[in-house]
């Protein structure tokens, strides 16, 4: 297994637990609601949409709990006070996995939490005997693209999202 990624002082790992599904959804919403991703994927800009997305991810037979984490900020006694980051993972095939929705809330960005999340999730994929992991990222999210590159991801293709009919009518 990979070395357990270190978190900054005052943060802790929260492993997947079904009771935490709304916590994941809330962090996902806070992470993406004001970002370009929420315009491309409207469910990310809506708390109910994030709850629905988390349910869709976690009820799939391909869901991998050991790749799914929250990072929480803790008080002096170690009690979680603010959930700051979330990640989930799915099995795509026998040996291939896919990272889903790496999200860090705006006030906790720049602390290395995204990198730690990716590393922790990759360890879970490795424990599940995955030898290849993929993810999708919005090309204009330069910070995320750079992060993924530094942990070993490479661009293998570019995809374009179809324009919705309602947006066409606006022109």
Which role does the model predict for each range below?
Residues 1-17, 162:
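Acyl-donor-binding surface of acyltransferase catalytic domains
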Residues 96, 125-136:
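Conserved GNAT acetyl-CoA-binding A-motif
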Residues 101-104, 110-127, 146-150:
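Conserved acetyl-CoA-binding loop-helix of GNAT-fold acetyltransferases
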Residues 123, 168-171:
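Extended, charge-rich intrinsically disordered regulatory tails
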Residues 31-36, 44-96, 100, 105:
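Acetyl-CoA-dependent GNAT
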Residues 12-39:
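A short beta-loop-alpha structural element at the N-terminal edge
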Residues 111, 115, 139-157, 165-168:
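Conserved active-site alpha-helix within GNAT-family acetyltransferase domains
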């Amino acid at each position: 297994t990979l070395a357990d990624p270190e978190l900054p002082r005052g943060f802790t790992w929260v492993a997947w637990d079904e009771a935490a599904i709304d916590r994941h959804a809330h962090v996902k919403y806070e992470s993406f609601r004001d970002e370009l991703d929420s315009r491309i994927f409207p469910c990310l800009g809506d708390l109910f949409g994030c709850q629905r997305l988390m349910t869709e991810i976690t009820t799939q037979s391909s869901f991998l709990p050991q790749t799914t984490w929250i990072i929480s900020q803790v008080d002096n006694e170690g009690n979680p006070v603010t959930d700051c980051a979330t990640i989930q993972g799915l099995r795509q095939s026998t040996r291939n996995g896919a990272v889903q929705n790496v999200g860090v809330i705006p006030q906790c960005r720049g602390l290395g939490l995204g990198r730690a999340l990716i590393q922790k999730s990759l360890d879970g994929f490795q424990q599940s005997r995955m030898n290849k992991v993929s993810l999708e990222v919005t090309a204009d999210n330069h910070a995320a693209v750079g992060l993924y590159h530094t942990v070993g991801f490479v661009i293998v293709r570019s995809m374009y999202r179809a324009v919705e009919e309602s947006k066409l009518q606006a022109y």
